[in-house]
Swiss-Prot record:
Chain spans, region Disordered: 14-49
Subunit and interaction comment: Part of the 30S ribosomal subunit. Contacts protein S5. The interaction surface between S4 and S5 is involved in control of translational fidelity.
GO molecular function, one term: rRNA binding
Protein name (Swiss-Prot/TrEMBL): Small ribosomal subunit protein uS4
Alphabetical list of PROSITE patterns matching this protein: RIBOSOMAL_S4, S4
Keyword vocabulary terms for this entry: Ribonucleoprotein, Ribosomal protein, RNA-binding, rRNA-binding
Annotated function: One of the primary rRNA binding proteins, it binds directly to 16S rRNA where it nucleates assembly of the body of the 30S subunit.
InterPro entries hit by this protein: Ribosomal_uS4, Ribosomal_uS4_bac-type, Ribosomal_uS4_CS, Ribosomal_uS4_N, S4_RNA-bd, S4_RNA-bd_sf
């Protein structure tokens, strides 16, 4: 198992949930966290603990984002008009690495970030190698010609465990996706319940 795979499953074990809906997730076989003390019975969680857990789960889902980066995203969501929790999800889903993952060009969000960093993706015809790059509605994301036959890409397209959401239009024959619209929380196909309102409460303490 690669370090990336190990880290990903460690997040699942820590959360006690299969947050990406992966068939090989260890929490499909056991219901306790990582480490020698993972089997201890958990008591009732405090409000702070519940809020912290919601933040960790959302950060983990998008590839274990660094706290500074996640907080900056929250701060921008908070500055925008409208519901902060909805704004937060919209900003996270507008990340290039999230869109490449949603389009099923890669098997995981971790692989998406690496794929982009290695220069395999263009946005509106221009190569972009920053996973956190923010896309706008109407942007066209394409796998570069020389990268379309990579085994990682070919296998990801065939994954039956997740579907492409309707806010992303994809042509897998051409390996092109259009970010059709910015989604709301109810549009996003999370395999587990995400609670961005608790993230808002956490940062509002």
């Amino acid at each position: 198992m690669s370090k990336r795979e190990s880290a990903k499953y460690k997040i699942d074990r820590r959360m006690g949930e299969n947050i990406w809906g992966r068939p090989k997730s260890p929490v499909n076989r056991r219901e306790y966290g990582p480490g020698q003390h993972g089997q201890r019975r958990k008591g009732k969680m405090s409000d702070f603990g519940t809020q912290l857990r919601a933040k960790q789960k959302l950060k983990g889902y998008y590839g274990e984002l660094r706290e500074k980066q996640f907080r900056a995203t929250f701060d921008e969501a908070n500055r925008r008009k409208g519901d902060t929790s909805e704004n937060l999800i919209s900003l996270l889903e507008s990340r290039l690495d999230a869109i490449v993952y949603r389009a099923k060009f890669v098997p995981t969000v971790f692989a998406s970030r690496q794929f982009i960093n290695h220069g395999h993706v263009t946005v509106n015809g221009v190569r972009v190698n920053i996973g956190s790059y923010r896309c706008k509605a109407g942007d066209v994301i394409e796998v570069r010609q020389k990268s379309k036959q990579l085994v990682t890409v070919l296998e990801a397209v065939q994954l039956a465990e997740r579907d492409v959401p309707d806010y992303i239009e994809v042509d897998h024959n051409k390996m092109v996706a259009t970010y059709a619209r910015v989604p709301s929380l109810s549009d996003v196909p999370y395999p587990v319940v995400m609670e961005p309102h608790l993230v808002v409460e956490f940062y509002s303490r």
